Amino acid sequence: MENRTYTADATPGDTVTVAGWVHEIRDLGGIAFLILRDTTGKIQVKFEKDEMDDDLVETGLNVQRESVISVTGAVEEEPRAPTGVEVTPESVDVISEADPELPLDPSGKVDAELPTRLDNRTLDLRKDEVKAIFEIRAEVLRSVREAFRELNCTEINTPKIVATGTEGGTELFPITYFGQEAFMNQSPQLFKQLMVGSGLERVFEIGPIFRAEEHNTPRHLNEATSIDFESAFYDHTEAMDACEHVVQSAYEGVAENCQDQLEALGLEDEFAAPEGDFPRLTYEEALDKINATGELDEPLVWGDDLSTEAEHVLGQEVGEHYFITDWPSEIKPFYIKDHDDDEEVSTGFDMMHPSMELVSGGQREHRFDHLVEGFEQQGLDPEAFEYYTKMFKYGMPPHAGWGLGGERLIMTMLGLENIREAVLFPRDRQRLSP
C-alpha cells in the first residue's frame, strides 16, 4: 500500500495513513476510540462525534472487529492512549469486512482451547503472544545459521523423497513415486555424511523431517524441523563443542533481538542464555544419578534406554542443559562409531534440556568394513543402502555430527506446554489440515 505508515512509526505532528485490523472499539458516548493493530503494534484512533462528519463516524464505529481498514489522519500526543499517541481521522476506508461470528477472540480476552486455535491459526496468530513465538522462532533460525557460518559450514539441502529410510524400521511415510515405492525422509543423516566426504567437508541443513511415529504427546510431531550438522575430521567431543555454540547462539540472538516478544510472553525477566560449558555425563553416570533418586519403579541397568520419566528425573538433578555420552553401542544406530578401546561403548551422545532430549549425535563409522558389519548387526541389508555405503570405499574421512529438533528447542526455550505451539500448522496423528 503506497504511503502506508506502520503504527510504531506514527510520529506526533505528521499526517499518516495507517492500515491494519480493528482490534477493539470503545464507544463512550460523545467520544469513541478504535484501536487499530498492525504487525508493529497498536494505535488509538479518536472519534469526537460532535466535531466529525456523521458518515466518517459511522464508518469507523460500525465496522466489525478484525476487519481490515485504513485510516488517514493527524497524529497527536495523548499520554492516556495505549502507545502515547493517537490519530484524529480524516478518512476511514474499510478494505475487508470481517464476519461478526469469530471462531476465537484474537484480543485474548476469551481463551480458546489449542485444537480451536490450530483450526483457526490465522486468527490465532493475530494475538501478540502467539505472533511473538514465531518471531522468536525466526530469530532462532537466523542466529543458528549465523552460528554455523562462524563454524565455516556450508548450508545444504538434501532430498525429502527417498528409496529407503535412514534407519530402517517402520517409522516411514510411504508414497508412490512414478510407480516405484518411495518414502518421506525421516532424517538427512546419510546424505549429510556423504557431503563431508565431498569437497564441502563441513555442512549444515535446516529442513523438514517426517516420522510415522505412533506417539501422540505434547512433545512429538510427525513433521518437524531438524537442524543438522556434520563435519569431516571432527570427533564426538568437537561435535559437542559445536552443538553448545549453536544452542547458546540461538539463546543469545533471542535475548539481544527479541525483547518485545519476550515481554509479550511474560519472559522478559527470567529469560537468559545458558553460559559456560554444558555438563557432560557418561551414560553410566546418568544411570547412577537416576537410580540414586529411587524415583523409578525399577532401577535402570546397562542397555536400557531412558524413558520420559527417567529423563525428567535426571533433568531435575542436573538442572541445566547437559550431555549424556558413551551410550551402549547396542542402542545407537549403525552409523555411530564405537570407542576404539571398547566396542560395547559408542561415541554417541545426546544433548538434553532438563525437561527433554534436544539433540542426538556422535562420531560416525567411516571405515567401510565396520560400517557394513554395523548394518548386519542391526538386521539391515547393506545392499539397500548401496548409494551410501559405496562412497565409503572411496576415501571417507573421520567425521561427526548431530541433529537438533527445532521445535523442541523453541518449546524448551520459551517454556511452551505443547510442541504444537511452536509450529504454524502442526502435523500429528489427528491433524492433516489446515
From Swiss-Prot:
Region named Aspartate: 189-192
Residues where ATP binds: R211, A212, E213, R219, H220, L221, E357, G405, G406, E407, R408
Cite the InterPro entries for this sequence: Aa-tRNA-synt_II, aa-tRNA-synth_II, aa-tRNA-synth_II/BPL/LPL, Asp-tRNA_synthase_2, Asp/Asn-tRNA-synth_IIb, NA-bd_OB-fold, NA-bd_OB_tRNA
Which Enzyme Commission numbers does its entry carry? 6.1.1.23
For this entry, list what GO says about its biological process. aspartyl-tRNA aminoacylation
What sort of enzyme, by top EC class, is this? ligase
Per the annotation, which location comes first and is thus the protein's main one? cytoplasm
Q: Name one GO cellular component term.
A: aminoacyl-tRNA synthetase multienzyme complex
The cofactor required is: Mg(2+)
Stored CDD domains: AsxRS_core, ND_PkAspRS_like_N
GO MF term set: aspartate-tRNA ligase activity; aspartate-tRNA(Asn) ligase activity; ATP binding; magnesium ion binding; RNA binding
Residues binding Mg(2+) 3 are E357
Q: Which PROSITE patterns match?
A: AA_TRNA_LIGASE_II
Where L-aspartate binds, per the record, is at E167, R211, S360, R364
* Record keywords, A-Z: Aminoacyl-tRNA synthetase, ATP-binding, Cytoplasm, Ligase, Magnesium, Metal-binding, Nucleotide-binding, Protein biosynthesis
The annotation note on the cofactor reads: Binds 3 Mg(2+) cations per subunit. The strongest magnesium site (Mg1) is bound to the beta- and gamma-phosphates of ATP and four water molecules complete its coordination sphere.
Site residues, Important for tRNA non-discrimination: P82
Q: Where does it live in the cell? A: Cytoplasm
Q: Where does Mg(2+) 2 bind?
A: E357, S360
Q: What does this protein do?
A: Aspartyl-tRNA synthetase with relaxed tRNA specificity since it is able to aspartylate not only its cognate tRNA(Asp) but also tRNA(Asn). Reaction proceeds in two steps: L-aspartate is first activated by ATP to form Asp-AMP and then transferred to the acceptor end of tRNA(Asp/Asn).
Please give the family membership noted in the entry: Belongs to the class-II aminoacyl-tRNA synthetase family. Type 2 subfamily.
Tell me which PANTHER family the record gives. Answer: ASPARTATE--TRNA LIGASE, CYTOPLASMIC, ASPARTYL-TRNA SYNTHETASE
Oligomer status and interactors: Homodimer.
Q: What is this protein called?
A: Aspartate--tRNA(Asp/Asn) ligase
Question: What organism, scientifically named, is this protein from?
Answer: Haloarcula marismortui (strain ATCC 43049 / DSM 3752 / JCM 8966 / VKM B-1809) (Halobacterium marismortui)
Tell me the classification of the organism that encodes this protein. Answer: Archaea, Methanobacteriati, Methanobacteriota, Stenosarchaea group, Halobacteria
